């Protein structure tokens, strides 16, 4: 059950990848049909307008996801994917192409902001990184399938048919995912819990083999809603900077200039045949998908920070080499040799990019924010990604035509150098931590006391944490520990009643119970200092015996 749900959810990544990958080869044929060059503003606009749509989609996804849930948000994205793909495949002119690209862009933005959050909320800490990377694997796999299928259509069909079929076929995965929504994909248990649906949340969590006691954080607010103001709080600012900064670095690495414009890059680098640049985009997409698959096994083994550092510094070296070679192509380096060098260097670049800066930003985005702010924060970080993406994608082909390959990649190298500095000083390690531990880590960094207090050894599910100063939540934990109550999760509003049910029948027994809790936390100096206060609070909270 769990594997099928993960695969169905990750289909959104495939749609994201297919629709971003298909435009590379399709545009290379479409430009001849509609009569514009690969360095024209029309060429750049067709790419960039979808990214602008994705920026808007990422913004509105937060409102849909918070108000109606993750599943309806994914359903909206599927509907837009179908409409945009079919409309673009049948487009009679450039204007209709642009409209359909906006629709597809909205779908990409909604999907890219929602699915990493959904996957993070239904996965245990041990497998959370690999699960979110699975979405990236489907994304890069979609780019690979798009490159291969579009190349076949371009080579073996007429100029007005190949690109239309390749784009229109992108509606099929959206239909499949919409079908999966009806029969396989449940709502996020965290979202359900935040809306007060404790029983439904438990039912979903049982199917995923996830301990609902970890999800007590969701009870803090009566609902999850979009509000960007809390993101400016003292313990949230660094998280916003980190998640948004990593998304911007991902785009400034030049990855989507390669995925959108590899045909143009290889053509300018020496592959002057009209078909060869399109065909050679296939091995590049394959390298991206292959090394994203590697990340599934490395992200939870070697950690987020280490993978990021290796990735960004390796990419910087490759970009500098590409820029140097770009200056000498056509002069000291022949086009035949330069084209081969470019192909090899771009392949190595993707091998370094994919398991690090390619997927880790999405993992971190899904991990570092509390439940009630996760949709807002994911919206901001994803908008940062698409904002940087639209800038790079709009400017890149124009720069290629104005200052050539060497000058363009020199600028990208400079941006990547800034990214290396950012990662070195800002990236943190979240490998193996529960969402509560991650929250405490960022609060400590901000000079604030932890929100969750560890009362013993916490398992992978994060049980054993309570929110400091909250007797109601302490009672909720007791309910989670009692098998006789079905491991139920109670909401904050019912916490006092729950405490009464699990407490001992007299004041002295209640006092003894809390003494035992304090003793079990004796390793915490703060707990020792506050034992008397906790004890007295427990006595006051207990029901009095009738006289």
Swiss-Prot record:
Main localization, broad class = membrane
What family is this?
Answer: Belongs to the major facilitator superfamily. Sugar transporter (TC 2.A.1.1) family.
Q: Where are the transmembrane segments?
A: 3-25, 44-64, 79-99, 102-122, 137-157, 165-185, 246-266, 277-297, 309-329, 340-360, 386-406, 408-428
Q: Which residues lie on this side of the membrane: Extracellular?
A: 26-43, 100-101, 158-164, 267-276, 330-339, 407
Q: Show the segment(s) annotated as Disordered.
A: 449-468, 510-547
Q: Where in the cell is it found?
A: Membrane
Its membrane topology, per UniProt? Multi-pass membrane protein
Which superkingdom, per the lineage? Answer: Eukaryota
Q: Note the CDD domains from the entry.
A: MFS_HMIT_like
Q: Which GO terms describe its cellular component?
A: membrane
Matching Gene3D superfamilies: MFS general substrate transporter like domains (1.20.1250.20)
Q: Name one Pfam family in it.
A: Sugar_tr
Please indicate the ranges of residues that lie on the Cytoplasmic side: 1-2, 65-78, 123-136, 186-245, 298-308, 361-385, 429-547
Question: For bias kind Polar residues, which ranges apply?
Answer: 519-529
Which is one GO molecular function term here? transmembrane transporter activity
Q: What protein is this chain from?
A: Membrane transporter D1
**SUPFAM superfamilies from the UniProt entry:** MFS general substrate transporter (SSF103473)
Signal peptide segment: none
**Keywords from the named record:** Membrane, Sugar transport, Transmembrane, Transmembrane helix, Transport
